[in-house]
């Protein structure tokens, strides 16, 4: 029975009621057919209320279950909630059921169950009508059954306003599938600040969305230049919580731009050094993705993934065993695609494998060579393009992967001791942990955030301040300093050298923790000190930057001297500093000069290390040679320690530069002022001392010019001495002739009475002087001849023979003079005068003979000394040549032995490889025969 619409009901309700009335009139059965109409029994009303409660509870349970299952999707409104949809379904259901029953059963079966189906349909229609009437009573105040259950118009309109409130709820905006409508970051931060409870789901979900967007943007902006800055910004977020998002974004970014795989691998390596579990998760996901694409035969994705894995191997994130497993998998059953993928993988990580696993790389290339040879023999040949790729890979290996470096210098950011290598293989990586990509409520959110904040401060310190805030802070600091400047009246000075000790410790630890000298120089140069007078960062007592540089240079020299043996690391480091700035070069030059001044206080080990350091700096022209200008190679100005120091320096210079190059450097006229004291030319005695010193240490070749200068000086001195001797002999002969003429005049005047006696006495007195004068001129002539002959010949024996002849001639002349005087009898004063003359003449002759003997003795001594020195030099040169020849023979024998050992090992490996291949072929042949036999 249908009701007429009430005039007090709203228009929409009246339309629904009219529509229901039309449907009831069009239905095939009437309400009277239903024995359980809601107007007939109150018991049915109670059952309807209980069924309504059950349906509500089941709806709530279903909604809660759907919320737990899909937290990010809002509860969708079902179309069944509308009465209009129910009415359409109600009108459709009989025909559908009839059509299904007609299709599913035969006609006889339909006739037999006709009554039962009619009853079932009538019961379902009555049940739908009752539920429809109840919903209509709830919606329309004019259709309510009792005044007790009536509702106010405000309450009736309230359900229509609830969906609008839900649209404005930020929680529902973030629960949708795409994250809801776009919310600007400023508005999202404002919404997040308005939530006081940080452990609530709404706050954590907002934080998750913000973190996801920021990580995605940072990963997309990374490149080789801003890698460090991007890492610092990434670590500002909780990467432990968002490691799934981070790994997903890195993999997606690498897949979109495979050319930047090395950049993303460097980013992963930096994060892996601080958070190893993130690097392991990334590697595991890549391996799972590689296996999935390999099974699907997706070559493009496989090539991109193995490029990323190869660069992770280069960055020491993944172990090289993973590379070998991939190569074995690709080349075990070679195809065009697998060989192409393997060669692409080798290009990326071949340089690293050559460095850390050369034997494994050789086996891989042997397999490629075998594949190429099998391709040429068999009918099932690979594509010609793949064969060319294998040949290209062989050429790349021959060039030692020069075009494919393992790690670019700009991306080599992790120290070797900080690298953490994950030994995952293809079988271990199973679970990619995709559940980390979705949001999960954290009951201990604040505690975990505080823990990560402490970790972040340990890694990168406090968060960076924006430029505006920095300027404000700097302005505030300047104002505060300007205000506090007049107040400062006292200053505390620390004289305990604690700052110096701390600085030296820092420099020493920096040197010990550096891998090579370039890294050490970079770290030491980063230790900046302000140029102002007050230094509060490292050293409080150092007032200027130049003093800081001097202290650093002295520390480097001390570290080099303290080593047990000389280390080339310090020489290369100091050379780098000298080439960087002139201030460092001048500082090291001053230190070298001070070292020679205090060399007697240094023990032999430090002395040797410092000498080798100075020799290295001189040979590389890192410092100037003027540091040797203070060295004076004389017996008075040198000590034993100083001579040992100079000896070590020149021995190292010869070893580094060679004798010829060092000799040209020493004889260079532009550097003559640097070696004035080393090779003195002012005093022959000092020159002999320098010559003897360099000859004793086996470097007599450096003193050739000094020897020539000394020989020229000796010859010049000898010429001067000979001239003086000739002048002295001529003056002696003239004085003798004048004395003889005076004596003859006196004898003529005294004996005037006796003419015969006077004439005889005058004749006898005149004849001997004439003979003596003649003999004097002859002797002078002969002496000049003998001197010329001696200079021409330079023979000591000829000189001695001439001297003996001269002495013999003089003795014969004296004997003849004495015999003539004895033959002529003298009397009185004449006899006495002639005796005095003989005595004076004999004294002069003896003194002259003594001088000649002394000159000859000194000449013989000098010649013997020169001969002895030449013999020693010759013996030393022979010994050094023999030692060098022995060393060369040993080196040649060692190189020959190494070459033979290498050849033997290679031949052994080839034989083993050939034997292994033969066994494998034999096994394959036996297996194929067995299969053929079974078939």
UniProtKB/Swiss-Prot annotation:
Chain ranges of the MI domain: 502-633
Name the record gives this protein: Pre-mRNA-splicing factor CWC22 homolog
Region of interest: Disordered: 1-179, 463-489, 725-935
Coiled coil: none
Taxonomic superkingdom: Eukaryota
Signal peptide per UniProt: none
Cell compartments where the protein resides: Nucleus; Nucleus speckle
Record bears the keyword Metal-binding: no
Family classification: Belongs to the CWC22 family.
GO CC terms in record: catalytic step 2 spliceosome; nuclear speck
GO MF term set: RNA binding
Biased composition (Basic and acidic residues): 13-25, 49-70, 159-175, 780-891, 897-935
Acidic residues: bias regions: 465-483
Residue span(s) of domain MIF4G: 212-400
Summary of the function given for this chain in its UniProt record: Required for early embryogenesis and tissue differentiation. Required for pre-mRNA splicing and for exon-junction complex (EJC) assembly. Hinders EIF4A3 from non-specifically binding RNA and escorts it to the splicing machinery to promote EJC assembly on mature mRNAs. Through its role in EJC assembly, required for nonsense-mediated mRNA decay.
Listed transmembrane segments: none
Single Gene Ontology BP annotation: mRNA splicing, via spliceosome
Pfam families (UniProt xref): MA3 (PF02847), MIF4G (PF02854)
Entry keyword set: mRNA processing, mRNA splicing, Nucleus
Composition-biased stretches (Low complexity): 729-763
Basic residues bias spans: 84-148
């Amino acid at each position: 029975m249908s009701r007429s619409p009430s005039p007090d009901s709203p228009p929409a309700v009246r339309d629904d009621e009219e529509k229901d009335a039309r449907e009831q009139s069009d239905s095939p059965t009437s309400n009277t057919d239903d024995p359980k109409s809601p107007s007939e029994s109150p018991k049915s009303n109670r059952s309807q209320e209980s069924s309504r409660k059950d349906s509500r509870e089941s709806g709530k349970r279903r909604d809660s279950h759907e919320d737990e299952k899909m937290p990010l999707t809002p509860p969708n409104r079902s179309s069944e909630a509308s009465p209009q949809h129910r009415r359409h379904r109600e009108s459709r259901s009989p025909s559908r059921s009839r059509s299904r029953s007609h299709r599913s059963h035969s006609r006889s079966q339909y006739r037999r169950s006709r009554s039962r189906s009619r009853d079932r349909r009538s019961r379902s229609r009555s049940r739908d009508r009752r539920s429809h009437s109840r919903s209509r009573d709830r919606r329309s105040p004019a259709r309510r059954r009792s005044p007790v259950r009536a509702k106010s118009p405000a309450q009736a309109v309230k359900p229509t306003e609830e969906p609008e409130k839900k649209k404005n709820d930020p929680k529902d905006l973030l629960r949708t599938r795409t994250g809801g409508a776009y919310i600007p970051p400023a508005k999202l931060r404002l919404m997040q600040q308005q939530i006081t409870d940080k452990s609530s789901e709404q706050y954590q979900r907002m934080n998750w969305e913000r973190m996801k967007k920021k990580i995605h943007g940072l990963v997309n902006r990374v490149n080789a230049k801003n890698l460090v800055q991007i890492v610092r910004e990434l670590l500002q977020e909780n990467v432990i919580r968002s490691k799934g998002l981070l790994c997903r974004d890195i993999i997606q970014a690498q897949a979109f731009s495979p050319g930047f795989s090395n950049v993303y691998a460097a980013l992963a390596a930096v994060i892996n050094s601080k958070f190893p579990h993130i690097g392991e998760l990334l590697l595991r996901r890549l391996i799972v993705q590689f296996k999935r694409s390999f099974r699907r035969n997706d070559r493009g994705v496989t090539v991109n993934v193995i490029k990323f894995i190869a660069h992770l191997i280069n960055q020491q994130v993944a172990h090289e065993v993973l590379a070998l497993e991939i190569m074995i998998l690709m080349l075990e059953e070679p195809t065009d695609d697998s060989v192409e993928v393997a060669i692409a993988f080798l290009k990326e990580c071949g340089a690293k494998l050559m460095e850390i696993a050369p034997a494994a790389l050789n086996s891989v290339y042997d397999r490629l060579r075998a594949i190429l040879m099998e391709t040429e023999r068999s009918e099932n040949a690979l594509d010609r393009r793949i064969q060319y790729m294998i040949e290209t890979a062989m050429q790349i290996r021959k060039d030692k992967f020069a075009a494919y470096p393992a790690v670019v210098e700009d991306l080599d950011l992790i120290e070797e001791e900080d690298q953490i290598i994950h030994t995952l293989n293809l079988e271990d990586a199973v679970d990619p942990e995709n559940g980390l990509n979705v949001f999960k409520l954290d009951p201990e959110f604040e505690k975990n955030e505080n823990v990560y904040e402490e970790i972040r401060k340990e890694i990168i310190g406090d968060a960076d301040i924006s430029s505006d805030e920095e300027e404000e802070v700097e302005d505030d600091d300047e104002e505060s300093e300007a205000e506090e400047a007049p107040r400062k009246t006292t200053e505390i000075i620390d004289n305990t050298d604690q700052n110096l000790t701390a600085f030296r410790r820092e420099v020493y630890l920096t040197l010990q923790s550096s891998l090579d000298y370039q890294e050490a120089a970079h770290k030491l140069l980063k230790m900046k000190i302000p140029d102002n007078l007050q230094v509060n960062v490292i050293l409080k007592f150092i007032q200027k930057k130049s003093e800081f540089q001097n202290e650093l240079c002295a520390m480097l020299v001390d570290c080099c001297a303290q080593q047990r043996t000389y280390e080339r690391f310090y020489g290369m480091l100091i050379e780098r500093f000298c080439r960087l700035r002139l201030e460092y070069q001048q500082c090291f030059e001053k230190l070298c000069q001070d070292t020679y001044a205090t060399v007697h206080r240094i023990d032999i080990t430090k002395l040797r290390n410092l000498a080798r350091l100075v020799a290295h700096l001189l040979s590389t022209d890192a410092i100037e040679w003027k540091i040797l200008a203070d060295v004076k190679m004389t017996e008075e100005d040198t000590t034993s320690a100083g001579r040992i120091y100079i000896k070590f320096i020149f021995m190292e210079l010869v070893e580094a530069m060679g004798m010829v190059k060092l000799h040209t450097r020493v004889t260079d006229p532009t550097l003559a002022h640097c070696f004035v004291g080393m090779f003195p030319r002012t005093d022959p005695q000092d020159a002999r001392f320098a010559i003897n010193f360099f000859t004793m240490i086996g470097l007599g070749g450096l003193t050739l010019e000094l020897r020539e200068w000394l020989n020229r000086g000796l010859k010049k001195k000898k010429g001067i001495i000979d001239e003086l001797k000739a002048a002295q002999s001529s003056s002696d002969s003239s004085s003798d002739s004048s004395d003889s003429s005076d004596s003859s005049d006196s004898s003529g005047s005294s004996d005037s009475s006796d003419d015969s006696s006077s004439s005889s006495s005058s004749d006898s007195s005149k004849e001997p002087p004439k003979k003596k004068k003649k003999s004097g001129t002859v002797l002078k002539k002969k002496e000049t001849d003998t001197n010329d002959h001696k200079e021409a010949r330079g023979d000591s024996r000829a000189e001695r023979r001439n001297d003996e002849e001269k002495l013999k001639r003089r003795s014969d002349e004296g004997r003849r003079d004495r015999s003539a005087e004895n033959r002529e009898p003298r009397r009185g004063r004449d006899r006495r005068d002639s005796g005095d003359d003989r005595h004076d003449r004999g004294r002069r002759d003896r003194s002259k003979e003594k001088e000649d003997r002394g000159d000859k003795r000194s000449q013989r001594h000098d010649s013997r000394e020169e001969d002895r020195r030449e013999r020693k030099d010759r013996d030393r040169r022979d010994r050094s040549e023999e030692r060098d020849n022995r060393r060369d023979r040993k080196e040649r024998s060692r190189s020959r032995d190494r070459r033979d050992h290498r050849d033997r090992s290679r031949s052994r490996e080839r034989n083993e490889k050939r034997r292994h291949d033969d066994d494998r072929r034999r096994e394959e042949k036996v297996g194929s025969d067995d299969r053929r036999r079974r078939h």
